[in-house]
Amino acid sequence: MTEQVLARGEEIFRLIPQRPPMVMVDVLYSADETGGRTGLTVSPANVFCINGFLAEPGLIEHSAQSAAAFAGYRYFLAGEDPHVGLIGEIKTFRIARTPKTGEKLKTNVNVIGEAMGMSLVETETFSGDEKIAGGQIKIFIV
């Protein structure tokens, strides 16, 4: 069964403020009031790829941009441009392994709480059925 797609490719630029070469999300599968699901195909041209693998900072940035894509979709529905978000804290983030180029990642974003321009999200990144990374990220929206 094919998964629903809300935005992909260039459409993502309506949802996140990042631009190449710093774009770490290439598809938004779903978004609702509690979270969303994004994807990234790891490309050898990715700035975080080293020796055929997406380095740890790339996985963290992908998770943060996944949260940004979810938030950006809400802004898009309200007729607004995406807002800039800054990583305020990375908490309990675990990386089981780094993915190889060509792997297709899917990341679930669950909003734990929001207040005064700050969002606390829990992310889980999968390659197929294997959870390869995840944790909590605090993001400040400016």
Pin down the residues of each PLM region.
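Polybasic, low-complexity association/targeting segments
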Residues: 1-7
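Hydrophobic beta-strand-centered segment that forms part of the acyl-chain substrate-binding groove
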Residues: 5, 69-106
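Short aromatic-glycine motifs in intrinsically disordered, low-complexity regions
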Residues: 9-19
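Catalytic strand-loop segment that frames the active site of acyl-thioester-processing enzymes
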Residues: 19-55
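HotDog/MaoC-like acyl-thioester-processing domains
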Residues: 37, 69, 100-102, 106, ...
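A conserved, well-ordered hydrophobic junction motif at loop->secondary-structure transitions
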Residues: 41-75
